[in-house]
């Protein structure tokens, strides 16, 4: 354990929208498949989020949450459109708030990444263009103008539903090859109308979704997640990638959202190193506006290092979002501040559908339990 409290940048308070965080260690959104067949979070999901609200002033971002039945792409993922779903989320939010923490709901539409077997009731596999994820994969249908407008409205209604359920805000999932990203990136978007064909047009869908969500719930309740370099689901391969995301991020800055979340998935190209593992080019575009969350395999040491480096370069608005380590370490902020090693995670149980295994059975540190008088 640390001998003295650290003054590290990672441990300094940060205002995110309406939320006054006591440190800069965020729980990143992680899909876990612990919802029933109707997209209602299972009863024990409340305990999962409650465990990770272990240090007051922590921001948690939920797993990806479907905005409508048509947006569904996988079984056992939660939704936010029905009253039973919202009631389950109200209980989860109440549990998090009782621990003096904050929680944003991540809003999701899968597009062409959906499992075709899940698309029941005459739902089509849809995307920006009729371009499959893989060359011989299922062929999606390009959305029409009316459908695009309806999807934008659906994101706005989902945001209202989330705020009605008590969430402190929402995060728009514009990353990792899902529907919004399918409009942003030229590797998928082959349109030649006002939704494609140029950097500005490809960014339009993300911008209009964000604008509609802001109009619905307020800019200080809206975060946006992007993943410029992610190669997941056929993304991250376009030319003009940096200019595309520089433009989009500049537009998000003008919209004055509560935060920008930039995620780096595991780099898949073994032939060359990652061009920008800490998204420094995009941090510069974002500047000193609202907070910027960086995610991408950080541990305690690398999180402290990058926040110090960013602060030294005048970017004092940087926070770190932990995914896998927050799964395995419910008391993660406490451990990092105390200098206690983070717990190893079991990747095999990340997606153990409907199971408590690998979900509720990661222990708190002995030091945390002693401090909070847990029974031994």
Swiss-Prot record:
The keyword Oxidoreductase applies. Substrate binds at residues 173, 176, 351. The gene is easA. Ergot alkaloids are known for their toxic effects on humans who consume contaminated grains or livestock that graze on grasses harboring ergot alkaloid-producing fungi. Due to their strong affinity for monoamine neurotransmitter receptors they may also have clinical uses such as treatment of migraines, Parkinson's disease and cerebrovascular insufficiency. This is Chanoclavine-I aldehyde reductase easA. Its cofactor is FMN. It comes from Aspergillus fumigatus (strain ATCC MYA-4609 / CBS 101355 / FGSC A1100 / Af293) (Neosartorya fumigata). Belongs to the NADH:flavin oxidoreductase/NADH oxidase family. Its EC number is 1.3.1.100. One of its GO terms (molecular function) is NADPH dehydrogenase activity.
């Amino acid at each position: 354990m640390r001998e003295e409290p650290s003054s590290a940048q990672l441990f300094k308070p940060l205002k995110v929208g309406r939320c006054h965080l006591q440190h800069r260690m965020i729980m990143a959104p992680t899909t876990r498949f612990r919802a029933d067949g109707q997209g209602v979070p299972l009863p024990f999901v409340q305990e999962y989020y409650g465990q990770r609200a272990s240090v007051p002033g922590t921001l948690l971002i939920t797993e990806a949450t479907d905005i409508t039945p048509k947006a569904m792409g996988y079984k056992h993922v939660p939704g936010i459109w029905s009253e039973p779903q919202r009631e389950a989320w109200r209980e989860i939010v109440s549990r998090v708030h009782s621990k003096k923490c904050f929680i944003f709901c991540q809003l999701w539409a899968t597009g062409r990444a959906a499992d075709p077997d899940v698309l029941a009731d005459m739902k089509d596999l849809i995307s920006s263009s009729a371009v499959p994820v893989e060359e011989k994969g299922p062929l999606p249908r390009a959305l029409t103008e009316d459908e695009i407008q309806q999807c934008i409205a659906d994101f706005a209604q989902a945001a209202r539903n989330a705020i009605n359920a008590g969430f402190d805000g929402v995060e728009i999932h514009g990353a990792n090859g899902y529907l919004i990203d399918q409009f942003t990136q030229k590797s998928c978007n082959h349109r030649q109308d006002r939704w494609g064909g140029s950097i500005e047009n490809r960014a339009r869908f993300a911008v209009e979704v964000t604008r509609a969500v802001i109009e619905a719930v307020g800019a200080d309740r809206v975060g946006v997640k992007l993943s410029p370099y992610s190669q997941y689901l056929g993304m991250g391969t376009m030319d003009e990638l940096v200019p595309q995301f520089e433009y989009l991020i500049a537009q998000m800055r003008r919209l004055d959202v509560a935060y920008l979340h930039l995620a780096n998935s595991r780099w898949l190209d073994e032939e060359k190193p990652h061009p920008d593992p800490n998204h420094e080019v995009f941090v510069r575009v974002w500047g000193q506006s609202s907070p910027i969350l960086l995610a991408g395999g950080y541990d305690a040491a690398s999180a402290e290092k990058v926040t110090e480096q960013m602060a030294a370069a005048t970017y004092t608005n940087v926070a770190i979002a932990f995914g896998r380590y927050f799964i395995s370490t419910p008391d993660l902020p406490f451990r990092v501040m105390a200098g206690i090693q983070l717990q190893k995670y079991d990747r095999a149980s990340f997606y153990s559908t409907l199971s408590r295994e690998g979900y509720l059975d990661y222990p708190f540190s002995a030091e945390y339990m002693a401090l909070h008088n847990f029974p031994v």
